[in-house]
Amino acid sequence: MIQTETMLDVADNSGARRVQCIKVLGGSHRRYASVGDIIKVTVKEAIPRARVKKGDVMNAVVVRTKFGIRRPDGSVIRFDDNAAVILNNNKAPIATRIFGPVTRELRTEQFMKIISLAPEVL
């Protein structure tokens, strides 16, 4: 469950290391985002000479949460960190690599690129 002010790790090679959620998209008073939801983030920490700079406001999709996600069979998938992948205005990842596992819940039409780049799909 990601909400406003939540700090997330970045699971791609866009150059950002940490981002902060500034808005959960999808509804005027929506409070929480889970895996597969799009959020508005600001870059808090970035590496030098990267595609994104500190202070940039971007869209991102949540790929891992500590809270976890419940599957229809009753199992729960939890991770050790909250992580996101930074998107461009067309909802496509700006990075060319994804780090760490992602969940099968991202397997929708708009996030198939993330699934194909990920080293492991749980």
From Swiss-Prot:
It comes from the Bacteria. SUPFAM superfamilies: Ribosomal protein L14 (SSF50193). One of its GO terms (molecular function) is structural constituent of ribosome. PANTHER family: 50S/60S RIBOSOMAL PROTEIN L14/L23, LARGE RIBOSOMAL SUBUNIT PROTEIN UL14M. The keyword Ribosomal protein applies. Belongs to the universal ribosomal protein uL14 family. InterPro entries: Ribosomal_uL14, Ribosomal_uL14_bac-type, Ribosomal_uL14_CS, Ribosomal_uL14_sf. Part of the 50S ribosomal subunit. Forms a cluster with proteins L3 and L19. In the 70S ribosome, L14 and L19 interact and together make contacts with the 16S rRNA in bridges B5 and B8. The gene is rplN. The keyword Ribonucleoprotein applies. It comes from Acinetobacter baumannii (strain AB0057). One of its GO terms (biological process) is translation. This is Large ribosomal subunit protein uL14. Binds to 23S rRNA. Forms part of two intersubunit bridges in the 70S ribosome. Keywords: Ribonucleoprotein, Ribosomal protein, RNA-binding, rRNA-binding. One of its GO terms (cellular component) is cytosolic large ribosomal subunit.
